Each structure stands twice: as C-alpha cells, then as structure tokens.
C-alpha cells in the first residue's frame, strides 16, 4: 500500500492546530485496536509456527507447544492442584512482559508465585502445567485462544516455567478474605 502524503500533511496540521480530525475519536480508537490485534495475530502465528518446529517439543491438538528444558523428577500436578512456580512471560516478539524473578526483586520477596490451576490461571496453564513434573523447567507456547483471548488483543504467549512445588487445591493458595463492605449492613 502507498502512503498518501496529502493525508499525512493534513493529519500533522490537524494535530498541530488542534483542529478536528477526519476520523472521530471512537472510530480512531477502534481502528488502532483492530490494527494492533491484526499485528498480534500475525506475530502470534509466526511464533506458534516456529515453536512447532522445535526439536523434541510436544504439540497438542489445542495448539499449545511444550518444550522440556530440564525434566523434573517429581510428580505431575492435576488440574485441581495448586502450584508454586517461577516464570517469565514473553510476548510473540520475545519481549519480557512479566517475570516472577523481577517481581520478587522489586518487592524484596524471596517466595516464588503460588497459583491455583483450577480457576486462578489462563486456560492454557490449566491444560499444560499438569504435563510438567515437579522440579522441571519448561518453555510453553500458548495460542491466544488458550491465553487471554480477544480481550488481550489475540496475543499468543510464551512462558518459561519452573515448577517448584505442588499441593492439593487450597493448600498453597489461600482463599482471600472477603473485603469488608462500606456503609454498614
């Protein structure tokens, strides 16, 4: 596609002089969101295609890819268990989005993250973590449909996961106490 320089000039003038734009704010927001979603789909498809080519990786029918980096020696959790993990989350471009290691450093904590596989994680984790063994280190590629879906812009994710501990549901992740309600009874 070619860039229409007249439209670019008009856009700069409108921005400079703070005049109305050719596209309404809501329409512009929707266009940008759709553009980002389209880019996410392209980048996600590329990441997932490459992941499926990793030698020795398991590819499941739901599109999830699991690569064993270091096999654990313990048992596998069930979908109803709680787990304690260390993890690094990257997007389809390889940028680190979140890291339990960084969160510990920033908070001064020494504890890994406790998660409930039954409702406390994305569907991809509920499926793939039970394929891991305690003590193991894994990389898993999760298609957007098994991650946060459309609400997160159709972005597929890659996780490095170290499975530290396994416990029956409710033993490692304590239920949150209900917050007191404002305004009395």
Model-found features: residue ranges?
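Cross-family detector of peptidyl-prolyl cis-trans isomerase
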Residues: 1-185
């Amino acid at each position: 596609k070619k860039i229409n320089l007249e439209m670019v000039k008009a856009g700069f003038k409108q921005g400079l002089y703070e005049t109305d734009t050719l596209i309404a704010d809501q329409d512009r927001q929707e266009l940008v969101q759709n553009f980002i979603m389209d880019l996410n789909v392209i980048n996600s498809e590329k990441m997932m295609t490459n992941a499926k080519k990793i030698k020795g990786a398991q590819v499941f029918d739901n599109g999830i890819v699991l690569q064993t980096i270091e096999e654990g020696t313990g048992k596998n959790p069930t979908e109803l268990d709680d787990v304690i993990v260390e993890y690094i989350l990257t997007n389809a471009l390889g940028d680190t989005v979140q890291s339990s290691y960084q969160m510990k450093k920033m908070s001064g904590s020494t504890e890994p993250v406790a998660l409930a596989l039954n409702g406390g994680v994305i569907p991809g984790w509920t499926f793939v973590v039970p394929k891991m063994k305690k003590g193991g280190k894994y990389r898993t590629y999760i298609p957007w449909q098994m991650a946060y879906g459309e609400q997160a812009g159709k972005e597929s994710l890659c996780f490095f996961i170290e499975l530290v501990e396994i416990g029956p549901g409710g033993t490692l992740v304590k239920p949150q106490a209900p917050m007191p309600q404002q305004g009395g009874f």
